[in-house]
């Protein structure tokens, strides 16, 4: 995405670190968590590559259509898997947002808005609202619950890759990253 270099590199670092943690979560003994972690790792690394500042690297013209194909496939997979759990609907929205941003970058790789008008396009605004709500809800879910003193012992017995609060923090950071990327579209 085309924005200032320093925040762009911070976003790259955040998304790459999140993607790396999600790869480690793929070693979980829980199959559903492994699958979700794989989807989230793809999203984290994809966001990291897309967030590289344009001043540092200008990708060839074929990159954005390739992104659209990869994340279009991820969206179709999320749609198929959403039959078994509503969490995959968020993966569907995230993959669709990546397809949308890749399409915007394909049509105008050097400008933020390819739509010619002033203001925020309707789809961008809808995605911004969705991810803002997702970030707020995810942040609230990370707040400690009163009476959860016994959960500290349970958490120490779990493998660090299987801890749900770390997975929630991972999803929260990717939601924040998606918000930042959508603001530059």
Which positions does each model-derived feature cover?
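Alpha-helical membrane segments of multi-pass proteins
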Residues: 1-185
């Amino acid at each position: 995405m085309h924005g200032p270099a320093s925040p762009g590199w911070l976003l790259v670092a955040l998304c790459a670190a999140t993607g790396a943690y999600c790869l480690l979560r793929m070693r979980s003994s829980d199959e559903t968590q492994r699958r979700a972690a794989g989807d989230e790792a793809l999203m984290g690394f994809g966001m990291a590559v897309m967030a590289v500042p344009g001043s540092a690297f200008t990708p060839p013209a074929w990159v954005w259509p390739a992104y659209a194909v990869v994340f279009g496939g991820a969206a179709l997979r999320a749609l198929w898997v959403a039959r078994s759990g509503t969490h995959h609907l968020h993966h569907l929205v995230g993959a669709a947002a990546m397809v949308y941003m890749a399409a915007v970058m394909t049509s105008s790789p050097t400008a933020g808005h390819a739509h010619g008008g002033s203001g925020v396009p309707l789809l961008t605004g809808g995605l911004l609202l969705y991810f803002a709500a997702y970030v707020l809800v995810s942040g609230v879910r990370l707040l400690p619950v009163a009476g959860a003193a016994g959960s500290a012992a349970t958490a120490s017995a779990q493998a660090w890759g299987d801890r749900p609060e770390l997975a929630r923090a991972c999803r929260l950071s990717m939601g924040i990253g998606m918000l930042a990327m959508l603001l530059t579209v």
